[in-house]
Amino acid sequence: MACELRAVLLWGRGLQTVLRAPALAGVRRGKPVLHLQKTTVQFRGPTQSLASGISAGQLYSTQAAEDKEEESLHSIISNTEAVRGSVSKHEFQAETKKLLDIVARSLYSEKEVFIRELISNASDALEKLRHKLVCEGQVLPEMEIHLQTDAKKGTITIQDTGIGMTQEELVSNLGTIARSGSKAFLEALQNQAETSSKIIGQFGVGFYSAFMVADKVEVYSRSAAPESPGYQWLSDGSGVFEIAEASGVRPGTKIIIHLKSDCKDFASESRVQDVVTKYSNFVSFPLYLNGKRINTLQAIWMMDPKDISEFQHEEFYRYIAQAYDKPRFTLHYKTDAPLNIRSIFYVPEMKPSMFDVSRELGSSVALYSRKVLIQTKAADILPKWLRFIRGVVDSEDIPLNLSRELLQESALIRKLRDVLQQRLIKFFIDQSKKDAEKYAKFFEDYGLFMREGIVTTAEQDIKEDIAKLLRYESSALPAGQLTSLPDYASRMQAGTRNIYYLCAPNRHLAEHSPYYEAMKQKHTEVLFCYEQFDELTLLHLREFDKKKLISVETDIVVDHYKEEKFEDTSPADERLSEKETEDLMAWMRNALGSRVTNVKVTFRLDTHPAMVTVLEMGAARHFLRMQQLAKTQEERAQLLQPTLEINPRHTLIKKLCQLRESEPELAQLLVDQIYENAMIAAGLVDDPRAMVGRLNDLLVKVLEKH
């Protein structure tokens, strides 16, 4: 009955089945047991056939089957190698010895990464072979990675069918540090007392990671070049290694790790499978453990975005980024014009560290052509400022034989970079509209990269595209609410040509700045910029959407901003007379000497007694900060040529006018402090501690009156 039902079901799917009568196999536990004969399933068509998975001898019983069909195993690992000829001894390079000493003392929690590192090396060897053969138009052999555990012997073996190594390559690759990651690893540890799993996990130490768990490491390798002999490489990590010619070595590389007594758990199949699933599930080649296929092999960037689940994206992100978090944003981008592109990009959830921000780090995006790896980290596929992006780019337009040098200079790569940059910018703009709060958190964490993009990009149109991603608080909006340059421009009154901004550490200081106070009379919206590099960024941007970006400090001294626009409507008895003002300014010029270029009156201020104006103050401030020049007030004044503008209605200025004749000593202390306060408000004083003595003197003078 069951066989008949199966035939009906298969027929309903457009298939026909040829069934043979079951044969009595015998009796088990008093119940009849039947064997199904070999079954063939065929498509309805003259040339299509599909063999079913039911084999002769499979149990069919009235009880639950106790014996499952054995999964077919496939392994290339066998003990065929034998050393022949003489053995040559070599010493490790000094840096390699240091690295081996570090990994030998690594913490237990770090040790599992050796599996990831060796699988990664095997994958690289296969990629190199595939790339070579595809370029030469040759047929590809079976390209696989095999792992084998042996609990009795306490070993774990990894073997690939990749490009293999010659004797010279064994000496060079396994005796010296050639990987930049290993060099960076050593440099990162110079200032650390202990090794860190984060550092080992971040850099990786390639082949040498095997010595974290090994008493002895055997390597058998044979180059894929025709008629190449095989070799054995052997070391216990003590400082020397041996190389000898060996027979029975198949093309590729085989590594046998003899585990330390406290690392025998890595000879357990389940332990190794857990590590592979954690780190190497998306290796681009079939991965076998003790003969069983264990990895997911899908170029998901080639799939339809609708067919990929969030879980698949998370797993793939963790693999390519070697990370443990989830992607904050995911962009699956496919297009056929102007270039053929299949790509997936991820933004990490974790906030970047200072190391991640470093411009020394390259791209973390892999470049493929027709699923053949060109570069693991293609430095030129995205502009430098987008180095926080993780992902994969595949383009059929890229020739497989493109060298690293041509990759840097290729017009095709430049075009690809421009297309991807524009698409990522558009994606971030879309995300900001979709979820403003989530985007604001992203900008808080990654905004430094966008500022860098504006500063380092030469083309103005690209600068302005990146500038659409910037976010600032505004005088026209409540505290905490962010706005963009396009939004600011949309609120501008007709005929307005400038976008105004003010750089300050926080909103309170911005709103109480004398420069913002001077702008309030114009009823003009001002962007508040709080980050260290905002000023430099906007200086480089210069304009946006044909509107000039102007600091409110600069606006005060530009030619079109005439003083007569501000009329003093206060009663005459509340301000100094014109003659008193002229006399006071002359006295102040003399009292301040070379520290000021000029002293003049302003009616822009209300609550502040004075302010300093400098032509292009933002640029001047940045210059002083970067060059660390002009330590004294006189040196700074010589560079800045500041003008001190005083408010004749302010109590301090009116009192100063009286004191300059009645108490000249106190008046000098007061004018020095007014000037210093104005310089601090302008951000032109790095260390205000120098004025503490003067403040104490002023307090003493005040107390003498009481």
Curated annotation (Swiss-Prot):
GO cellular-component term (any): mitochondrial inner membrane
Matching InterPro entries: HATPase_C_sf, HSP90_C, Hsp90_fam, Hsp90_N, Ribosomal_Su5_D2-typ_SF
Modified residues (Phosphothreonine): T176, T496
Predominant cellular place of this UniProt entry's protein: mitochondrion
SMART domains linked: HATPase_c (SM00387)
Keywords: Acetylation, ATP-binding, Chaperone, Membrane, Mitochondrion, Mitochondrion inner membrane, Nucleotide-binding, Phosphoprotein, Transit peptide
Biological process annotations from GO: negative regulation of cellular respiration; negative regulation of intrinsic apoptotic signaling pathway in response to hydrogen peroxide; translational attenuation
Localization (cell): Mitochondrion; Mitochondrion inner membrane; Mitochondrion matrix
Xref: Gene3D superfamilies: 3.30.230.80, 3.40.50.11260, Heat shock protein 90, C-terminal domain (1.20.120.790), Histidine kinase-like ATPase, C-terminal domain (3.30.565.10)
A Gene Ontology molecular function term of the record: ATP-dependent protein folding chaperone
Residues bearing the modification N6-acetyllysine: K264, K326, K334, K426, K433, K468
Family statement drawn from the similarity comment of this UniProt entry: Belongs to the heat shock protein 90 family.
Function of the molecule: Chaperone that expresses an ATPase activity. Involved in maintaining mitochondrial function and polarization, downstream of PINK1 and mitochondrial complex I. Is a negative regulator of mitochondrial respiration able to modulate the balance between oxidative phosphorylation and aerobic glycolysis. The impact of TRAP1 on mitochondrial respiration is probably mediated by modulation of mitochondrial SRC and inhibition of SDHA.
Assembly and binders: Binds to the intracellular domain of tumor necrosis factor type 1 receptor. Binds to RB1. Interacts with SRC. Interacts with SDHA.
Name recorded for this polypeptide: Heat shock protein 75 kDa, mitochondrial
Phylogenetic placement of the source organism: Eukaryota, Metazoa, Chordata, Craniata, Vertebrata
